[in-house]
């Protein structure tokens, strides 16, 4: 058993390896291998922020491109463990990123997942008029509402529905809209379908631009709030703006209060002016939902389908960006040192402190919930570590068993001879 443990420890040390090479511009490139299954180059950085870094990697066996997220354990509000748990529950559904591997390493946690395309905010900004056509908006509405329905059916609410949190897929999934970023996602009921209790006095959680009126009022979020946020997002897609987009305030609290007042002032028929009446009907319905009430998703999907039919629109997946040849999914390789990447990973020295400069899209989270997330993530991280240890010991035992069987067969062959 001691030899098994030693070999298991040896395998752990080889879970991640690296080598350095120079590219044509003489820039140092770190190549990091993960469990001999995946690898990524330090130059293939897709993005990053306060949560960590994301790289484009590759599956060494299938040569399939993947996304590799790296998160420091020292960040204030960790996300990867929480996100991986939710995505694993949704792994069999369309429009949710597939998770291939979650593994801890010293001061970082690594998650390997499906590589996706641009988010809807970037696609909107790349469009000629900084807005989408009615056709694209309605096709998006149907897919996004379907994602929200699936999420809710799995007892979760997203709590941060906005354009940046939906992306297009790649290759054969290019017509699929994916829901991403589950940092604020929470369960609204348990396995016995007991709904979370109604509460007041909550701080705004999510992004103020798309937050529901109930969220602004400090009421605990439920399914209805995700749906109201979707409505604001659809208005934004069609018009390229929201009436409260340029609201300013001396403090966050003053600004958010002004945004709430603007939302209360804008009745659905005024907010949806110039759009099909189905948008107006959508808002009237979702704003009247009760805290624990289950939304009629098929009714809402029917509204969007009805709007398409009345406007002679076919759901043929010919989105606006398909016509724009300038849109691509190039990597973003900015502001990140490639020097000794592997040693920095081991030591947890990567700078995870980049801030989002778009203040109007600032994400908020209740302080009490930060502590809840941290405690929950500690438990889940220990589960992942223990699971990895058990898997390694199990693999080693299988190897030893196979080796014993081979030796037995060999000895029998010798005896027969």
Segments predicted by a language model, with ranges:
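Catalytic-loop of the protein kinase fold
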Residues: 152-170
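ATP-binding glycine-rich loop module of kinase domains
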Residues: 59-81
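Activation segment/activation loop of eukaryotic-type protein kinase catalytic domains
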Residues: 169-205
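Structural motif in protein kinase domains
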Residues: 116-126
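Conserved N-lobe ATP-binding subsite of Hanks-type protein kinase domains
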Residues: 53
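Conserved N-terminal boundary motif of the eukaryotic protein kinase catalytic domain
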Residues: 34-45
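Short beta-strand micro-motifs within the conserved protein kinase catalytic domain, predominantly
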Residues: 98-109
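Activation segment signature within eukaryotic-like protein kinase domains
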Residues: 140-141
């Amino acid at each position: 058993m001691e030899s098994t443990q030693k070999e298991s420890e040896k395998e752990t040390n080889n879970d991640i390896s690296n080598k350095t090479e120079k590219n044509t511009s003489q820039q140092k490139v770190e190549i990091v291998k993960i469990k001999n299954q995946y690898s990524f180059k330090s130059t293939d950085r897709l993005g990053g922020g306060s949560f960590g870094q994301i790289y484009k990697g590759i599956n060494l066996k299938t040569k399939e491109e993947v996304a590799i997220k790296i998160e420091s354990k020292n960040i204030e509000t960790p996300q990867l463990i929480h996100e991986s748990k939710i995505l694993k529950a949704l792994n069999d559904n369309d429009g949710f990123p597939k998770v291939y591997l979650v593994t801890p390493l010293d001061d970082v946690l690594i998650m390997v997942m499906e590589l996706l395309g641009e988010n809807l905010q970037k696609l909107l900004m790349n469009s000629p008029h900084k807005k989408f056509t009615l056709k694209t908006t309605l096709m998006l509405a149907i897919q996004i509402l379907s994602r929200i329905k699936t999420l809710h059916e799995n007892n979760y609410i997203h709590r941060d529905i906005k354009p940046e949190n939906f992306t297009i897929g790649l290759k054969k999934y290019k017509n699929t809209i994916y829901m991403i970023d589950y940092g604020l996602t929470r369960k609204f009921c348990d396995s016995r379908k007991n709904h979370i209790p109604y509460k007041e006095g909550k701080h705004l959680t999510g992004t103020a631009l798309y937050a529901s009126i109930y969220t602004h009022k400090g009421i605990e979020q439920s399914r209805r709030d995700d749906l109201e946020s979707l409505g604001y997002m659809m208005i934004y897609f069609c018009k390229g703006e929201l009436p409260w987009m340029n609201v300013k305030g001396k403090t966050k609290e003053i600004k958010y209060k002004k945004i709430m007042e603007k939302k209360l002032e804008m009745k659905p028929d005024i907010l949806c002016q110039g759009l099909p009446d189905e948008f107006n009907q959508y808002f009237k319905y979702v704003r009247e939902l009760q805290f624990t009430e289950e939304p009629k998703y098929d009714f809402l999907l029917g509204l969007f389908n009805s709007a398409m039919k009345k406007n002679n629109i076919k759901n043929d997946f010919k989105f606006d960006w398909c016509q724009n040849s300038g849109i691509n999914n190039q990597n973003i390789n900015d502001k990140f040192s490639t020097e000794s990447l592997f040693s920095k990973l081991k030591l947890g020295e990567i700078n995870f402190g980049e801030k989002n400069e778009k203040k109007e899209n600032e994400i908020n989270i209740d302080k009490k919930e930060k502590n809840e997330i941290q405690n929950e993530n500690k438990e889940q991280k220990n589960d992942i570590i223990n699971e990895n240890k058990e898997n390694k010991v199990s693999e080693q035992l299988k190897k030893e068993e196979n080796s014993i069987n081979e030796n037995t067969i060999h000895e029998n062959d010798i005896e027969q001879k």
